[in-house]
């Protein structure tokens, strides 16, 4: 098939500018890497592989800040997913990915294929996916029917894909803020389990070994999806639907089972395996060849296609879903085909490993590409980004701290429970199957989801956490607080934190203020990860999250996994028994910058969040976890949005109990402070002495669990006495009422 343009026409008309490749990069490719003009197919491959989504050319210097090694880390960043040792020859495998741009444009398919892609990353490692989590960030729902529609479709996409494939969704988080009105965020996380001996890699090596394409056929959906994800939106972004992929969860289920059968039962046939994700065939094949220090030759006429007359450019850049690329030992091609045939899936040899390190493509009898493979994967032109500290942060450093003023603590609590970010998210989670496979111990709605590991006493805990408001106000402190939030959630479940994955969601990195925020927040994340011994083992970067120049808050999502060695000590979020003692873990300060109460009362956020004492928090959380493993803690709940008052209320929702709390030395405003690193725990009276001796000054006894459904809080300058049922009604009805609104 004739190329769409000659190399000379490409140089003159510059179509690559529409694919996020700059003129400087084009000249560098021509003059330094190829020493000739690239043809249409080749420049298409460069534009995809050099996109930020694939190359991380802007963010690589920042990613180097992260600690990636640890005594339990088996595989860090660089493969399909991170792998962490959980003893007994087993590992937990996990990764998070963003699908923000596709979900904003086409919410159902964008969300569904976001889930599908992250599943393939995990099972390509040889792990069976056991849980899905999602971190969803929407604009304001009130008076915004478009956002309500996008939310419904996003949730439906996540639920349909996960439910059809039979993997439980163990929760995550949902937040609402006007900064996401033009660019919603969908971050999906998958957790899998495997025996370490079964781990696979994405590599192609061994002269003459075959490159096999398996799974669904290739169509024209998702072409230039990677470059679409590496540019901001315009008012015309609805026309970009063709860059959104279409998923088939039933095909994914078959593909997963076939791949796992091959990996677990016939690993001697397999050299390497990788998902065809962003940038489709070119990304998976070029990365596998690079990893194996090999060359690769592909015949695109052999690629299974569901649409006629596809060009080499279209075949290589299609992001059709449910496809994998294998490197198979020569002589075992028919064996592999038989496995996939049993699942009614295509399995076709489309190429081979060759001498040298060139990447060669043939289409319709012509050589359409012959370039050094590393020019696509490693020779990406990195350009230093400009950075500048935003003026609003400089100004905030000179301003006095904001503190709320109000009459009634009870009324403020009711208003906070009605805020969508705080309100019960059952409207969302009830659309997900959280119990399939019968291993779920703690369902969505708690601080962390908990899943038992069959045939052992172990369990894994998992959570996702984001708070863009804190990161916006002070990126470094906000990054630290994001990690603290995840650590608290994992510890609250009874688990020891192991490692994290991340999704770094930011605006245009060419804006010096945004790039400064990216670097500073990642430094904060790195600092906290070192203190809490939670290395970064996987993740992704999603930049250009803005619409018509309006960027989202810098929103790094932390996905954390922890280990529970004995399921007898899984800790519930809700109080369990009347007369148990209630403790506040961690010190409370007047920390209101970026808080829910500030946004609710001011209509905006401002000021500087307090810097946490990372070492202090690490030490007392370590002691709290020790108390849990000794059976001293009955329940635990993290303090986050809304502060102490909200967490106290949540700990008695869906129970028969109430709380009698004495905070006579607390100013009423402190009920709503969001000081990080705090939890409320309940302890049986007979365990009081042992618990206090372990935690010391880090805990304060604040009250008792009662058998009456009343929340009573005595303060220095107020008293809150409220029926729990009325609070729970507000909390549960907020989101459903907004979704039913006609406005």
Curated annotation (Swiss-Prot):
Gene3D superfamilies documented for this protein: PurM-like C-terminal domain, PurM-like, N-terminal domain
Binding site residues for Mg(2+) 1: 97, 540
Residues reported to bind ATP: 56, 95, 502, 539
Pfam families: AIRS, AIRS_C, FGAR-AT_linker
Protein residues bound to Mg(2+) 2: 121, 275
GO molecular function ontology, one term from the record: magnesium ion binding
Sites where the protein binds substrate: 98-101, 120, 245, 319-321, 542
Cellular component terms per the entry's GO annotation: cytoplasm
Cellular localization per UniProt: Cytoplasm
Keywords: ATP-binding, Cytoplasm, Ligase, Magnesium, Metal-binding, Nucleotide-binding, Purine biosynthesis
Enzyme Commission number, as recorded: 6.3.5.3
InterPro entries, sorted: PRibForGlyAmidine_synth_PurL, PurL_linker, PurM-like_C_dom, PurM-like_C_sf, PurM-like_N, PurM-like_N_sf
Pathway assigned in UniProt: Purine metabolism; IMP biosynthesis via de novo pathway; 5-amino-1-(5-phospho-D-ribosyl)imidazole from N(2)-formyl-N(1)-(5-phospho-D-ribosyl)glycinamide: step 1/2
Enzymatic reactions: N(2)-formyl-N(1)-(5-phospho-beta-D-ribosyl)glycinamide + L-glutamine + ATP + H2O = 2-formamido-N(1)-(5-O-phospho-beta-D-ribosyl)acetamidine + L-glutamate + ADP + phosphate + H(+)
Active site feature: 53, 99
Biological process terms in GO annotation: 'de novo' IMP biosynthetic process
Assembly with partners or alone: Monomer. Part of the FGAM synthase complex composed of 1 PurL, 1 PurQ and 2 PurS subunits.
Task performed by this protein: Part of the phosphoribosylformylglycinamidine synthase complex involved in the purines biosynthetic pathway. Catalyzes the ATP-dependent conversion of formylglycinamide ribonucleotide (FGAR) and glutamine to yield formylglycinamidine ribonucleotide (FGAM) and glutamate. The FGAM synthase complex is composed of three subunits. PurQ produces an ammonia molecule by converting glutamine to glutamate. PurL transfers the ammonia molecule to FGAR to form FGAM in an ATP-dependent manner.
Assigned protein family: Belongs to the FGAMS family.
Protein name: Phosphoribosylformylglycinamidine synthase subunit PurL
């Amino acid at each position: 098939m004739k190329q769409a343009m000659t190399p000379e026409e490409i140089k003159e008309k510059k179509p690559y500018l529409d694919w996020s490749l700059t003129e400087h990069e084009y000249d560098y490719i021509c003059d330094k890497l190829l020493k000739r003009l690239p043809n249409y197919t080749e420049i298409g491959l460069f534009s995809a592989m050099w996109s930020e989504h694939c190359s991380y050319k802007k963010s690589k210097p920042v990613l180097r800040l992260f600690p990636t090694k640890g005594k339990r880390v088996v595989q860090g960043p660089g493969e399909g997913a991170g792998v962490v040792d959980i003893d007994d020859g087993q590992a937990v495998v996990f990764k998070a990915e963003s699908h923000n741009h596709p979900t904003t444009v086409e919410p159902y398919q964008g969300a569904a294929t976001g889930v599908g892609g992250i599943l393939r990353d995990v099972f390509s490692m040889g792990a069976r996916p056991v849980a899905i989590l999602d971190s969803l960030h929407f604009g304001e729902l009130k008076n915004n029917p478009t956002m309500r529609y996008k939310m419904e479709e996003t949730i439906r996409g996540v639920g349909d894909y996960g439910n059809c494939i039979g993997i439980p969704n163990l929760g995550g988080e949902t937040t609402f803020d006007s900064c996401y009105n033009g660019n919603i965020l969908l971050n999906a996380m998958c957790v899998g389990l495997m025996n370490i001996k079964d781990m696979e890699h994405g590599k192609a090596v061994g002269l003459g070994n075959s490159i096999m394409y398996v799974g669904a056929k290739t169509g024209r959906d998702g072409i230039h999806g990677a470059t679409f994800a590496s540019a901001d939106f315009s008012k015309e972004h609805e026309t970009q639907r063709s860059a959104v992929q279409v998923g088939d969860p039933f095909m994914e289920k078959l593909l997963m089972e076939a791949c796992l059968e091959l990996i677990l039962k016939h690993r001697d046939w397999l050299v390497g395996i990788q998902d065809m994700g962003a940038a489709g065939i070119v990304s998976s094949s070029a990365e596998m060849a690079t990893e194996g220090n090999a060359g690769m030759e592909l015949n695109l006429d052999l690629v299974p296609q569901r649409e006629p007359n596809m060009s080499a450019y279209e075949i290589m850049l299609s992001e059709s879903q449910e496809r994998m690329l294998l490197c198979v030992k020569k002589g075992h091609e028919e064996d592999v085909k038989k496995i996939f045939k049993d699942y009614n899936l295509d399995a076709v040899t489309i190429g081979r490993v060759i001498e040298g390190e060139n990447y060669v493509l043939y289409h319709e009898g012509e050589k359409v590409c012959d370039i050094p493979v590393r020019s696509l994967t490693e020779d990406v032109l990195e350009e230093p980004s400009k950075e500048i500290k935003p003026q609003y942060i400089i100004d905030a450093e000179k301003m006095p701290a904001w503190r709320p003023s109000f009459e009634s603590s009870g009324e403020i609590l009711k208003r906070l429970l009605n805020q969508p970010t705080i309100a019960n998210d059952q409207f969302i989670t009830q659309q997900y199957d959280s119990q399939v496979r019968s291993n779920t111990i703690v369902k969505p709605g708690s601080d962390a989801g908990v899943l038992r590991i069959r045939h052992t006493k172990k369990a894994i805990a998992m959570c996702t956490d984001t708070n863009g408001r804190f990161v916006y106000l002070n990126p470094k402190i906000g990054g630290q607080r994001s990690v603290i939030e995840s650590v608290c959630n994992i510890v609250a479940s009874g688990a020891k934190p192991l490692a994290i994955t991340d999704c770094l969601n930011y605006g245009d990195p060419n804006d010096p203020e945004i790039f400064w925020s990216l670097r500073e927040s990642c430094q904060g994340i790195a600092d906290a990860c070192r203190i809490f011994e939670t290395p970064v083992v996987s993740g992704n970067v999603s930049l250009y999250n803005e619409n018509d120049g309006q960027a989202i808050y810098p929103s790094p999502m932390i996905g954390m996994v922890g280990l529970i060695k004995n399921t007898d000590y899984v800790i519930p979020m809700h109080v369990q028994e009347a007369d148990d003692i209630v403790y506040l873990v961690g010190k409370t300060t007047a920390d209101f910058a970026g808080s829910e109460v500030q946004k609710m009362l001011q209509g905006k956020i401002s000021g500087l969040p307090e810097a946490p004492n990372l070492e202090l928090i690490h030490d007392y959380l370590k002691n709290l976890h020790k108390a849990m493993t000794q059976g001293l803690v009955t329940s635990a709940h993290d303090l986050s949005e809304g502060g102490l008052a909200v967490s106290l209320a949540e700990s008695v929702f869906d129970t028969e109990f109430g709380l009698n709390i004495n905070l006579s030395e607390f100013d009423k405003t402190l009920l709503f402070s969001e000081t990080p690193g705090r939890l409320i725990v309940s302890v049986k009276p007979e365990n009081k002495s042992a618990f206090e001796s372990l935690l010391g000054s880090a805990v304060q006894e604040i009250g008792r669990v009662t058998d009456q459904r009343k929340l009573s809080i005595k303060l220095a300058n107020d008293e809150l006495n409220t029926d729990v049922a009325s609070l729970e009604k507000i909390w549960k009805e907020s989101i459903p009422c907004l979704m039913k609104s006609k406005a």
